[in-house]
Amino acid sequence: VMLGLLLVAGIGVAVLLGPYALRVEHVAAEPRTGFHSDYYLYVPTTLHRDERGNATLLVQPNNSGRTSDDIGAHRRDAWMTGFERKRIADELGVALLVPAFPRTARDWRTYTHALDRDVLTTRDRLLARLDLQLIAMIDDARARLRKDGTPVDARVLLQGFSASAMFANRFTALHPDRVRAATIGSPGGWPIAPVAKVGVDALPYPAGIADLSALTGTPFDAAAFARVPQYLYMGDADDNDSLDFNDGWDKPMSAEVDRLFGDTPLARWTHAEMLYAQAGANARFELVPGVGHDRKALQERSTAFFREVLATP
């Protein structure tokens, strides 16, 4: 009987995981190509094509929710993230890329999964400039698909929630020319402001974009950023605030954000919305009544936004 139950359970797992497991490609790190971590690429059976015949790539940054020096733990989490987002890729008819970036315990202050300031300054090649590593992954995935006869838009759909929303939001500010549209769910208490200062107060990265040139060698491209359709959303009962922790923010900078804009995610929300409007951003902000820090309750809003974007030439 026990053997029979195990067999049934095994078949159930195979049926559940099968459609994703059979189609997902595990791409190993390729430092010479510019990425030091693995990624997962899932291609649904049917791909939506734009008017130029290009398919689209949806990028979902990984977020393990914890530090670990075991890269296998981050890979397993990234694989499961892809499995959970498979339905979205199928619905939209887009390929799905999930990086397996590590978030190490040995260097816990470098909050890789949120693309924090330390990621732009560290000398550790595994963790450094994950924005550029992700671009290398995107271009590697595009080359693989092109080899199979599927040209892919250089601009991606980018979505995230919590830490991965911080990554998606900050990546969009760093590389707006590579983003077709972005959905940003509960971005850690403060989305990056697309301005250099508020009044006389400078807003360095990741509070704002004041020192992007010094950090990256490339100035903020305000015109390209303004062209990216963005949807920023949060439950009005969400009190998840990355500014309270030392891994993602330097204390003086988080204190400055608290002083200027309020000390809770909800208090800061309208300030962020106003700064995006003043910068001419094509950004829709939405507070969802009665919802806390709940990705699954809010995912359909992100999917619907992308559906709208894909339907627009």
Predicted features and spans:
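Short amphipathic alpha-helices and their capping/turn segments at secondary-structure boundaries
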Residues: 40-50, 83-89, 212-231
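C-terminal catalytic histidine-bearing segment of alpha/beta-hydrolase fold enzymes
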Residues: 267-313
